[in-house]
Regions:
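Long, charge-dense, low-complexity tracts
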Residues: 1-81
């Protein structure tokens, strides 16, 4: 869960009227500094879902790299026995 929050913190919204983190967008809308009608929610949702999918793929790549590294360390250690 904490790792998912890290990915969510990295997501940036890019719109004509706003560019920045999602939580800042929500803050500005709540303070009525941005008009909710200028925000294409469907576009943000679609882009966020793509971002999450890319993050999951990256996470698997990192996990795969770790497994290879750990296996290599085990081979080296077993040769030293």
């Amino acid at each position: 869960m904490a790792q998912e929050q890290l990915f969510a913190d990295e997501y940036k919204v890019n719109l004509d009227v706003f560019e920045g983190p999602l939580d800042l967008l929500l803050y500005l809308i709540r303070r009525e500094e941005l008009d909710i009608y200028d925000i294409p929610i469907e576009r943000i949702t679609t882009e966020y879902m793509k971002f999450i999918e890319d993050a999951r793929r990256l996470n698997l790549d990192i996990a795969g790299e770790f497994i290879v590294m750990a296996a290599t360390l085990m081979v080296i250690k077993s040769r030293m026995l």
